[in-house]
UniProtKB/Swiss-Prot annotation:
A GO-annotated cellular component: plasma membrane
Keyword presence, Translocase: no
CDD domains to which the protein is assigned, alphabetical: MFS_MelB_like
Side of membrane Cytoplasmic, spans: 1-11, 61-79, 130-146, 202-228, 285-296, 344-372, 430-457
Record localization: Cell inner membrane
Top-level division of the source organism's lineage: Bacteria
InterPro entries per record: MFS_2, MFS_trans_sf, Na/Gal_symport, Na/Gal_symport_CS
Keyword annotations from UniProtKB, A to Z: Cell inner membrane, Cell membrane, Membrane, Transmembrane, Transmembrane helix
MF-aspect GO terms: symporter activity
Organism lineage: Bacteria, Pseudomonadati, Pseudomonadota, Gammaproteobacteria, Enterobacterales
Residue stretches spanning the membrane: 12-34, 38-60, 80-100, 109-129, 147-167, 181-201, 229-249, 264-284, 297-316, 321-343, 373-393, 409-429
Periplasmic side, ranges: 35-37, 101-108, 168-180, 250-263, 317-320, 394-408
One biological process term in Gene Ontology: sodium ion transport
Protein name, as recorded: Glucuronide carrier protein homolog
Gene that produces this protein: uidB
Length: 457
């Protein structure tokens, strides 16, 4: 439990999430708008596609988790995927923004499905081992909290940078001009992403000792089945991700049709990510040390709920107050997103404590499965609300559409953050219990190692 990690290792690990988000954040920020306003895919078709493919991605996570748990190489279980899986991922991150505008609508939809599914599968085969790697680097709670904070900051900075780089380029641009912008930036980001993944690979090591051999699929599933804290955390994560992606998918529509100024898109993303997540993530290790991971999550969820409720009421009549409300909500959301990674890592030890079986890959994949479902639901809710309210691309919108956009960006996230608070209120794995579990696991390993040594001698 004493594996203290250097800042070089922590920063190197976080660069992997920068690379992750070159593919991931582009989709969250721009893909729905690209499909509807540039590629000419209908809002309802785009929303359905985003929902179905992200559900496919969720199942791809489970497949990837099992693949990861079955691998053991001279580089470890997880690091090889960062080395060999990145090129296909980055290629698909370019292809999803390459819908040819002169195709028929049906051809565009088929191409969107195929390329987005390919992106999701490749992302799972890189992101699952990347996330699982944290559980193998250390069992020390503060170091795990720092890893979570570092990747949270890295992801948020990536969101902000992409918004500042690409947002102004598409401001007041025609659909034809936007095509060139998306093509240029996706290629640049793909090359940079491969470099950053390699740095992450070289900067990290797997330090947690494993004694038990790779378990069968049946034993692995039985281990998951008994892990009640993992299932509760997954449901809480589902709610937080629905909230997060409802905001991300609605932001461009909010600034374009409610505020009537796409130039404010970068400001909105800046407040949501830099002021929110980057401001909150450094606070999390200290909060964890003082009040524990569970209470840290609860404070974040409550702050997010109140912030989004205020944002809804002021989202039209006062932009400065609306930005303050969004900042409050984003700080709360940032706290929950950051501490979530440390909570997930703890559930690996809980499963090992109950059954003697350590399955980082499958545990993380189930956690990621529910996160992907949250992304799917949260990302598609705005599309469905737009369709139901009568949205027509690139036109002056009706009051019903404006209310739909406000609901998507504020009320939907408010409700799901409140639900996350209620669920984690009953979360059973406290920091005190976790420390007892790690001590027990270490004692078991010492006994097993001694038995192996005695038999060998």
């Amino acid at each position: 439990m004493n594996q203290q990690l250097s800042w070089r290792t922590i920063v190197g690990y976080s660069l992997g999430d920068v690379a992750n988000n070159f593919a991931f954040a582009m989709g969250a920020l721009f893909l729905l708008s690209y499909y509807t306003d540039v590629a000419g895919v209908g809002a309802a078709a785009a929303g359905t596609m985003l929902l179905l493919v992200r559900v496919f991605d969720a199942f791809a996570d489970v497949f990837a988790g099992r693949v990861v748990d079955s691998v053991n190489t001279r580089w470890g279980k997880f690091r090889p995927f960062l080395l060999f899986g990145t090129a296909p991922l980055m290629i698909f991150s370019v292809l999803v923004f390459w819908v040819l505008t002169d195709w028929s609508h049906g051809s565009k939809v088929v191409y969107a499905y195929l390329t987005y599914m390919g992106l999701g599968l490749c992302y799972s085969l890189v992101n699952i081992p990347y996330g699982s790697l944290a559980t193998a680097m250390t069992q020390q709670p503060q170091s795990r909290a720092r890893l979570g904070a570092a990747r949270g900051i890295a992801a948020s900075l990536t969101f902000v940078c992409l918004a500042f780089l690409i947002g102004p380029s598409i401001k007041n641009s025609s659909p034809e001009e936007m095509v060139s912008v998306y093509h240029f930036w996706t290629i640049v980001l793909a090359i940079a992403g491969m470099v950053l993944y390699f740095i992450c690979f070289k900067s990290t090591r797997e330090n947690v000792v494993r004694i038990v051999a790779q378990p069968s699929l049946n034993i692995s599933l039985q281990t998951l089945k008994r892990n009640r804290p993992l299932f509760m955390l997954c449901i809480g994560a589902l709610c937080v991700l629905i909230s997060t992606f409802a905001v991300s998918a609605s932001s461009l529509f909010y600034v374009r049709y409610v505020l009537n100024d796409t130039g404010l898109f970068t400001v909105l993303v800046l407040v949501q990510n830099l002021v929110g997540t980057v401001a909150s993530a450094p606070l999390v290790p200290g909060m964890v040390a003082r009040i524990g991971k569970k209470n840290t999550f609860l404070i974040g969820a409550l702050l997010g709920t109140c912030g989004y409720l205020l944002f809804f009421w002021v989202s039209v009549w006062s932009l400065p107050v609306a930005l303050v409300a969004l900042a409050i909500a984003s700080i709360g959301q940032g706290v929950t997103m950051t501490v979530m990674w440390a909570l997930e890592a703890d559930t690996v030890e809980y499963g090992e404590y109950l059954t003697g079986v350590r399955i980082e890959g499958l545990t993380y994949s189930l956690f990621s499965f529910t996160r992907k479902c949250g992304q799917a639901i949260g990302g598609s809710i705005p599309a469905f609300i737009l369709g139901l309210s009568g949205y027509i691309a690139n036109q002056v919108q009706t009051p019903e559409v404006i209310m739909g956009i406000r609901t998507s960006i504020a009320l939907v996230p408010c409700g799901f953050m409140l639900l996350a608070f209620v669920i984690i209120w009953f979360y059973p794995l406290t920091d005190k219990k976790f420390k007892e579990i790690v001590v027990e696991i270490d004692n078991r390993k010492k006994v097993q190692q001694q038995l192996i040594s005695d038999i060998t001698n």
